[in-house]
Swiss-Prot record:
Residues 341-353 have a biased composition (Polar residues). GO terms for molecular function: mRNA binding; poly(A) binding. This is Pre-mRNA-splicing factor srp2. The lineage of its organism: Eukaryota, Fungi, Dikarya, Ascomycota, Taphrinomycotina. Residues 166-365 are annotated as: Disordered. Residues 316-332 have a biased composition (Low complexity). Keywords: mRNA processing, mRNA splicing, Nucleus, Phosphoprotein, Repeat, RNA-binding. GO terms for biological process: mRNA processing; nuclear mRNA surveillance; RNA splicing. Has a role in pre-mRNA splicing where it is involved in spliceosome assembly.
Length: 365
């Protein structure tokens, strides 16, 4: 494995080899740059330049995508092994108190250009340009000796057409050193921690406050004893006591105080009420109703006798058919006008005949 060969991942598809060369420009001499489908390899001349590229470009945005920069490991990159060994071979940039303030910077000077110039005096660990104040920058060195060397040798150095001024920062020794994540370059702000990471690591909430509370609760009511004792008590005693005491006490007043007096006191009163109420009318068991029901029914008449004499089929209808017709004759004679004298003898003769006929019918009846 070469310490000067770097792997670059998550490269946008529209990026070209010239774009990669311009992106890493200012970090020493680039010997080779190979661009493939979504990743590539960059080889520099000096191992220190390779280390700076890893520290400064890891997670940096390139043409709309955050790239991954790691030391190359053959044809395949092994990120797990890199994380274990990168701390020793490629330590992250550290913030020190050996800081110089650079003034009169050109607008075209970047932090990469400033860092390349400061390497002439020593090993810069952190550089920044135009971040807080336009036209000013900051440089930190790993040792105080490198800082003193840069202050004496590079003060007045011309960078992109302007001579810069270097002076020591008096407040650098009193400021606390910020913690910089290893994934990002030193001049970038630290990444925000996620609540999920604190939750997985077991923060104060879970370890100190919440879990002891659960342990205390479980210490009073273990899971096994709760199932063995409480549930058994509920099944054996608790449930039986509830049924025997609560529900039986609830039903006992109805059985002892309400229902029993109802059978002994209320029903006799109800009988007395009925007897007093029935005084005004005969009861079902009085003598009048017994005599009425014991009386023999009236004799049944024959249907033939009850029929009308004019009803066809009756005995009276067949016995005197002529009598009924003759009885209607005088009625018809009364409706007629008065007869003449020649007809009166005949009418008297008929009357005699009718009288004899009526007498005969009466005798037969």
């Amino acid at each position: 494995m070469s310490e000067t060969r770097l792997f670059v991942g998550r490269i946008p598809p529209q990026a070209t080899r010239e774009d990669m060369m311009d992106f890493f420009k200012g970090y020493g001499q680039i010997l080779d740059c190979k661009l493939m489908n979504g990743f590539g390899f960059v080889e520099v001349e000096d191992a220190r330049d390779a280390r700076d590229i890893v520290n400064d470009f890891q997670g940096k945005e390139f043409m709309g995508s955050r790239i991954v920069v790691e030391p190359a490991r053959g044809e395949r990159r092994r990120r797990e092994n890199f994380r274990e060994s990168a701390a020793s071979k490629y330590p992250r940039p550290r913030r020190t108190g050996f800081r110089l303030i650079v003034e009169n910077l050109s607008e075209d000077v970047s932090w990469q250009d400033l860092k390349d110039v400061m390497r002439k005096a020593g090993e810069p660990t952190f550089t920044d340009a135009h971040r807080e104040n336009p036209g000013a920058g900051v440089v930190e060195f790993s040792t105080e000796e490198d800082m003193r060397n840069a202050l004496t040798s590079l003060n007045g150095e011309v960078i992109k057409g302007q001579a810069v001024t270097l002076r020591e920062d008096p407040d650098a020794a009193n400021e606390p050193l910020p913690e910089v994540p290893s994934r990002f370059r030193s001049r970038s702000p630290p990444a925000r921690r996620r609540y999920r990471d604190d939750y997985r690591r077991g923060g104060d909430y879970r370890r100190d406050a919440y879990r002891p509370g659960r342990d205390d609760e479980r210490r009073y009511a273990p899971r096994g004893e709760y199932r063995r004792n409480n549930r058994d008590e509920y099944r054996r005693g608790g449930r039986d006591e509830y049924r025997r005491n609560s529900r039986s006490d609830y039903r006992r007043p109805h059985d002892d105080e309400y229902r029993r007096p109802r059978g002994d006191e209320y029903r006799p009163g109800r009988d007395e009420y009925r007897r007093s109420r029935d005084d005004g009318r005969p009861s079902h068991d009085d003598e009048y109703r017994r005599d009425a029901y014991s009386r023999s029914p009236s004799p049944r008449r024959d249907r033939e006798e009850n029929r009308s004499p004019a009803y066809e089929g009756s005995k009276s209808y067949s016995a005197a058919p002529e009598a009924s017709m003759e009885s209607s004759a005088p009625t018809e004679s009364y409706d007629k006008p008065a007869a003449s004298e020649e007809q009166q003898p005949l009418q008297n003769h008929s009357d005699v005949g009718n009288g004899s006929a009526e007498g005969q019918v009466a005798a037969e009846w």
